[in-house]
Swiss-Prot record:
<feature type="active site">
    <location>
        <position position="132"/>
    </location>
</feature>
<comment type="function">
    <text>Cysteine hydrolase.</text>
</comment>
<protein>
    <recommendedName>
        <fullName>Carboxymethylenebutenolidase homolog</fullName>
        <ecNumber>3.1.-.-</ecNumber>
    </recommendedName>
</protein>
<dbReference type="GO" id="GO:0005829">
    <property type="term" value="C:cytosol"/>
</dbReference>
<dbReference type="InterPro" id="IPR029058">
    <property type="entry name" value="AB_hydrolase_fold"/>
</dbReference>
<keyword id="KW-0007">Acetylation</keyword>
<comment type="similarity">
    <text>Belongs to the dienelactone hydrolase family.</text>
</comment>
<feature type="active site">
    <location>
        <position position="212"/>
    </location>
</feature>
<dbReference type="InterPro" id="IPR002925">
    <property type="entry name" value="Dienelactn_hydro"/>
</dbReference>
<dbReference type="Pfam" id="PF01738">
    <property type="entry name" value="DLH"/>
</dbReference>
<dbReference type="GO" id="GO:0016787">
    <property type="term" value="F:hydrolase activity"/>
</dbReference>
<keyword id="KW-0597">Phosphoprotein</keyword>
<dbReference type="InterPro" id="IPR042946">
    <property type="entry name" value="CMBL"/>
</dbReference>
<feature type="active site">
    <location>
        <position position="179"/>
    </location>
</feature>
<keyword id="KW-0378">Hydrolase</keyword>
<keyword id="KW-0963">Cytoplasm</keyword>
<feature type="modified residue" description="Phosphoserine">
    <location>
        <position position="223"/>
    </location>
</feature>
Length: 245
């Protein structure tokens, strides 16, 4: 079974040919990609990378999509200058690579990003969205930072520990039915534990026939059968942010 200490490999999927609408900035000790909302509503969303890093065009595309819905978005380099995973890399070395990129040891970076959003972007309401590795970050943040009003964890691997179910604010979990990284058994455990321990609003949604990465690493035009699920998941993501931020 996949878990945070021994995850299964995931394919990069379709790398989008996308330039981006934002700009790269320095946020204290880390770099970040920031897109300002065309409407200054005092709302911001932290968008967390997958294992392929903060410069992946697909993640920036998602950040810009969210920004177009009224949020200033920021994609921080949560690897803090360390190299992202190489899609052509030897997966046998992945566990060792991951040791220095612990998705639950990012509080210093989160603190810096929150200061930047409040001081430089005048954000008063903040949410977070993350994909794959970033989905784990979202789960951690939503159990640690009460000031983050809403979270969307997209195919983030689940750790079975009591402390990860005490969510501080509403969180949406998106999974894929045919995910080789996250078995449905893990999703079922998450649902059961949230029922037992969570007192805030949450939703766990599994998309039929989809695979790991379908929300942000699969082109909408790649398969007519997949397109409705991709669009629905992205719509659900935006709706969750709109409802709770």
């Amino acid at each position: 079974m996949a878990n945070e200490a021994n995850p299964c490999p995931c394919d990069i999927g379709h790398r989008l040919d996308y330039g981006g609408m934002g700009q790269e900035v320095q946020v204290e000790h880390i770099k970040a990609y920031v897109t300002r909302s065309p409407v200054d509503a005092g709302k911001a969303v932290i968008v967390v990378q997958d294992i392929f890093g903060w410069q992946l065009s697909n993640t920036r595309y998602m950040a810009d999509m969210i920004a177009g819905n009224g949020y200033t978005t920021i994609v921080p380099d949560f690897f803090v200058g360390q190299e992202p995973w190489d899609p052509a890399g030897d997966w046998s070395t992945f566990p060792e690579w991951l040791k220095s990129r612990n998705a639950r040891k990012i509080n210093r970076e989160v603190d810096a990003v929150l200061r930047y959003l409040k001081q430089q972007c005048h954000a008063q309401k903040i949410g977070i969205v993350g994909f794959c590795w970033g989905g784990i970050v979202v789960h951690h943040v939503m159990t640690t930072y009460p000031e983050v009003r809403a979270g969307v964890s997209v195919y983030g691997i689940i750790r079975d520990s009591e402390d990860v179910y005490n969510l501080k604010n509403p969180t949406l979990f998106i999974f894929a039915e045919n995910d080789a990284v996250i078995p449905l058994e893990q999703v079922s455990i998450l649902i059961q534990k949230l029922k037992e321990h969570c007192i805030v609003n949450y939703q766990v949604k599994t998309f039929s026939g989809q695979t790991h990465g379908f929300v942000h690493r699969k082109r909408e035009d790649c398969s007519p059968a997949d397109k409705p699920y991709i669009e629905e998941a992205r719509r659900n993501l935006i709706e969750w942010l709109n409802k709770y931020i």
